[in-house]
Amino acid sequence: MAIQPGEARATGAGVEPVASPDVVWLRLETLSPRARRELDRIVAAAVALADREGLEALSMRRLATELETGTTTLYRYVTGRDELLELMVDAVNGSDGQVTGRPTAWRDGLTLVAREARARFLAHPWLASQLVARPTIGPNTLLGAEFVIAIALELVDDPDTAASVTSSLMAYVQGSVAAELAEREAQRRTGLDEHAWRETVAPWVRSILADARFPAFARVVLAADDLSFEERFAFGLERLLDGFATLEAHGPRGAATRKRTS
């Protein structure tokens, strides 16, 4: 029977996995140094284009134009746009200094991870949208995942709970960044910064403040500090970490669930 991609074959040295040609990370290992340099150049150009004009501008044809080459030449290195995007994500995770190494105290470590991720998402506005489906499993991305998972396991020695900690942390960062990027896009689309927009809607807001149906809204608008995106991010992150800290006192969710159902 023919061996299917991903199966194993017997060799004189034992069992050897058969590489699937569809897994780009395995295919990269077979490239010559020259071909790898050319692929890195292609990926770097794609990242620059997406940073500058967004993912909607990224196509194989447009990228070929940017590189002053033929579209068919690009297909010698990548199978298509989806594979290119996977390479772009991993390249950004490596070139932007994603945190790696031994975990520090869990709270400091998770704070560092969150702030590094926020900076990366803001520098590459297309990036967060690529992390909401199947995860990229390139080497740079996996090093970052290893770092944050190790920190979560320092907090709570339970794989289920550690996985929930890491996913909750990244979901918070992505949600926070989405709001900030939406404001950037609104400014680009309307030509109004936040101050100018507030001046535009001021007459309507004043009428709302005088309406007895909205006392809580009026109190916040009139009395609350006008926090920056950075300050809002920091506040939310600290509250999330406070929640994680309770895991030390009450034990892991996963372990507790297993005890109740056993």
Name the predicted role of every residue range:
Residues 34-59, 90:
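Short, amphipathic alpha-helix enriched in basic
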Residues 41-48, 83-98, 109-116, 143-150:
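Alpha-helical structural segments
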Residues 52-55, 68, 75-85:
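HTH DNA-binding helix-turn interface
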Residues 62-65, 74:
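Append "Primarily bacterial transcriptional regulators
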Residues 89, 118-143, 147-149, 178-188, ...:
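Amphipathic alpha-helical segments used for helix-helix packing
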